[in-house]
């Protein structure tokens, strides 16, 4: 194992036409690249092959966060256009946001949204502005009336009605994410029925995915990278389900990198404990996993923290080899793309 990992170690060549721009007609119609760590093999399947790999007493853990229409468009009092991406809701009328304008807004300046809503900028923390909504309505009211789904930057089109349903898991419950937990997008009701028939248990954690998930790693050395913070919750019910799974010799299967980060944040010395709060856990090769036994995930951007996490879990050489095979076999990449299972 290398002592000094570089961001460049996680680069790979991806033809732009392999970046999925739209979802498949069938949620569960995607392909599945399966990595067996014990045999060091890579095989090609359909997504229903995921259920085939699940065993009785396994625990499937998903992220129930709900994507909010977090992109707002407005104007300054001077008339200049402003784009606002809500990163985190702090209260009914207060939130943190990324703001794009011809000139960085000053503290105390106003942004007008659709004539009825006025936002005052009250603070700045690095790239984020603290904003207050001056209205009898809540921030969620504003977003659901005037916001747009914040599609990832690599999807080169404007969102449409189809995205409102498809850039959202069918089990989304807790509003607060600005990006979807994409591994869960493959699940439909038939998937859950099949898992239950296999004798698997299902439970949910919450991690509100922030825009930081799309930010590049700017440090050359991974040791110098600082992760963005995201809010998460692992309940006592989840911890109890994990304990029961262990007692019955089952496996904990994380559906997505967000679930992986939740469970590994909440687990110390192989014991999962309830936790609600911030996580900035950065998982890369050399990390010692305490909770998760298998990972279902999508394909991730070159040099991203998500690819680093997958390499930590699956093994660097094996995962990078699998990515090369995925490119050669024309898999669909990123949020609306195909899936990978590592067990």
From Swiss-Prot:
Monomer. Its EC number is 2.4.99.17. It is found in: Cytoplasm. It is an enzyme of class 2 (transferase). Pfam families: Queuosine_synth (PF02547). It comes from the Bacteria. GO terms for biological process: queuosine biosynthetic process; tRNA wobble guanine modification. InterPro entries: QueA (IPR003699), QueA_dom1 (IPR042118), QueA_dom2 (IPR042119), QueA_sf (IPR036100). Its main location: cytoplasm. It catalyses: 7-aminomethyl-7-carbaguanosine(34) in tRNA + S-adenosyl-L-methionine = epoxyqueuosine(34) in tRNA + adenine + L-methionine + 2 H(+). It comes from Coxiella burnetii (strain RSA 331 / Henzerling II). NCBIfam families: PRK00147.1, queA. This is S-adenosylmethionine:tRNA ribosyltransferase-isomerase. Keywords: Cytoplasm, Queuosine biosynthesis, S-adenosyl-L-methionine, Transferase.
